[in-house]
Curated annotation (Swiss-Prot):
It is found in: Cell membrane. GO terms for biological process: adaptive immune response; response to bacterium. The gene is TRAV13-1. V region of the variable domain of T cell receptor (TR) alpha chain that participates in the antigen recognition. Alpha-beta T cell receptors are antigen specific receptors which are essential to the immune response and are present on the cell surface of T lymphocytes. Recognize peptide-major histocompatibility (MH) (pMH) complexes that are displayed by antigen presenting cells (APC), a prerequisite for efficient T cell adaptive immunity against pathogens. This is T cell receptor alpha variable 13-1. GO terms for cellular component: T cell receptor complex. It comes from Homo sapiens (Human).
Length: 112
């Protein structure tokens, strides 16, 4: 029998209340098959935002910065993880390729 392993990616909405920034994350939950790609999108409200980090929080651990991007860059890659930014549309996305079981975590974005 073939075993199908699913990678569960749980998402968290991060609101940057210090700067009054509202950030919305879509989808709220995501499940993909091992080896597939996953994309998580965030939209933000303040066009003055210039720093866009993504965090990963594994069960029982604190959040860890996994990748970030500045407003003067459209795309940044680090191994299987990439982030893209569209300042005009006010959204940025986290892309994870070739998902693995260790990718199962809570992911959240912020903007400042």
């Amino acid at each position: 029998m073939t075993s199908i392993r699913a990678v569960f990616i749980f998402l968290w909405l991060q609101l940057d209340l210090v700067n009054g920034e509202n950030v919305e994350q879509h989808p709220s939950t995501l499940s993909v098959q091992e080896g597939d790609s996953a994309v998580i999108k965030c939209t933000y409200s303040d066009s003055a935002s210039n720093y866009f980090p993504w965090y990963k929080q594994e069960l029982g651990k604190g959040p860890q910065l996994i990748i970030d991007i500045r407003s003067n860059v459209g795309e940044k890659k680090d191994q299987r993880i990439a982030v893209t930014l569209n300042k005009t549309a006010k959204h940025f996305s986290l892309h994870i390729t070739e998902t693995q079981p260790e990718d199962s975590a809570v992911y959240f974005c912020a903007a400042s």
